[in-house]
Amino acid sequence: MGNSGFYLNDTQNCVFADNIKLGQMESPLQDQQLILGTKSTPTAAKLNAKEGLKIDISNTNAQSATIDFSIDADTLSKLILDQIQKGLVDAIIKDITNSLIQEVIDRIISDKNLALTKAFKNFSLSEKIQCNGLFTKSNIGTLLGGTEIGKFTITPDNVNSMFLISADIIASRMEGNVVLALVREGDSSPCAISYGYSSGIPNVCSLRTAVNNTGTDPVTFSLRVGGMDSGVVWVNALANGDSILGTTATSNISFLEVKQQTNG
């Protein structure tokens, strides 16, 4: 049995098996290169670590060169967390109505101090609710206008953040205006007011607003609905209180938290 292995032959790295030359490199190996077989002649290759991996080559001692593979825990952890966060945001965005998506985009474009966070919550209202309370000039700035149709509690993920709020309420009344008022618990007046209209048939009355948040304690909002100066308003029902087409109607209110960027 003759010599076999890798040898330097006329400044070229050659592969020998039993004194038979099997292949010849086109150029000498450089520092930290390896010989890699191909479909034709061997070629020089270098090991490269991708995200989350480390490669340490020790070749100062020609008699005991080593290659150590290990995991870069910090990089791998960040990579995994980033993918999880992206998946969460993608799932959240998929469930948001198109109108709210546009509201979020418009808000972020106009205020570059804001960025998306993962805090999103949606509430559905399917009960038929009769709203006998009215909104008038004398009570529009108080907590007495309209009828409360629901309370909604949100726990912020961040301090100094902001809630983007979107409400789509199915309302009916004998022809006239419908008023929606959003009240934050602890306030003495509504933090947002919106208006809709019904001509005796169901209509979607919407409220869009942004509300500042300062801490991480739970925040409770209530939504009040009523007629402007006169009239009974029905939520999720016809103007006479009957079901719409004999089915259950559902109104929604969504809260999306955004926060200030900390990376410029």
Curated annotation (Swiss-Prot):
Entry-linked InterPro entries: Chlamydia_pGP3 (IPR008444), PGP3-D_N (IPR049000), pGP3_C (IPR033758)
Keywords for this protein: Plasmid
Gene3D superfamilies: 2.60.120.1340, 6.10.250.2680, 6.20.30.10
Coiled coil region boundaries: none
Name the record gives this protein: Virulence plasmid protein pGP3-D
Source organism of this protein record: Chlamydia psittaci (Chlamydophila psittaci)
